Amino acid sequence: MSNPIAIDIHKILQLLPHRYPFLLVDRVLEITPRETITALKNVTMNEPFFQGHFPDFPVMPGVLIIEALAQTAALLTFSEERAEDAIYYFAGIDGARFKKPVLPGDQLIMTARLERGRAGIYKFAVQATVDGEIAAEANITCAVRSKGA
C-alpha cells in the first residue's frame, strides 16, 4: 500500500485535458495510486451552468456531478503519468442516485475507488458528498484510449 498524496491544480492541469468551463476538479486532497482518491470542487455562484439551471433556484446539474466524479476517477488512473496521446472516455454508468441538491457555496467532496482495471477499461465506485451527506453515488466505467484510435 502506498502513502497517500495530494495533487494541486497545476498537476491536475497536466493530467486532465479538461479546461474551463469543463474542468470540475479543483484539488485532490488524497490519493493512494491504483486504489482510492478524494478530490474537491468548490461550487460557486459564478459557475456558467447556474444561469440556466435554475435561475430562481440554482442547482448543480446531476450530469455535471457525474462528470466531476469521472474526472476524479481519471485522476486516479492518470495519477502517476498520462501518456501524451491518451484520452479518457466515459463508457458507462450503473446505479446512479442523486440524494441531495448541490447548491452555490457548497464544497463537493468526491471519492472514487478503483474496483477493476484491465486492458484500459476501469470500473469505479464513486460518491459525492456535501457537508458529510451523500449528494450522489454511482458505479462508472471508463476507457483509456489513444486519441487516434
Swiss-Prot record:
What's the domain of life for this entry? Bacteria
PANTHER family in the record: 3-HYDROXYACYL-[ACYL-CARRIER-PROTEIN] DEHYDRATASE
Protein's cellular compartments: Cytoplasm
What Pfam families does the annotation carry? FabA
- What is the documented function of this protein? Involved in unsaturated fatty acids biosynthesis. Catalyzes the dehydration of short chain beta-hydroxyacyl-ACPs and long chain saturated and unsaturated beta-hydroxyacyl-ACPs.
The record's EC number reads 4.2.1.59
The catalytic residues are: H53
Q: Which lineage ranks, top first, belong to the organism behind this chain?
A: Bacteria, Pseudomonadati, Pseudomonadota, Betaproteobacteria, Burkholderiales
Protein encoded by which gene: fabZ
Provide GO CC annotations from the record.
Answer: cytoplasm; membrane
Q: Which GO terms describe its biological process?
A: fatty acid biosynthetic process; lipid A biosynthetic process
- For this UniProt record, give its keywords in alphabetical order, as a comma-separated list: Cytoplasm, Lipid A biosynthesis, Lipid biosynthesis, Lipid metabolism, Lyase
Family to which the UniProt record says this protein belongs: Belongs to the thioester dehydratase family. FabZ subfamily.
Q: Which NCBIfam families match?
A: fabZ (TIGR01750), PRK00006.1 (NF000582)
Alphabetized InterPro entries for the sequence: FabA_FabZ, FabZ, HotDog_dom_sf
Location (main, coarse): cytoplasm
Please indicate if the UniProt record lists Lyase as a keyword: yes
Q: What is this protein called?
A: 3-hydroxyacyl-[acyl-carrier-protein] dehydratase FabZ
Q: Name one GO molecular function term.
A: (3R)-hydroxyacyl-[acyl-carrier-protein] dehydratase activity
Q: Which reaction does it catalyse?
A: a (3R)-hydroxyacyl-[ACP] = a (2E)-enoyl-[ACP] + H2O
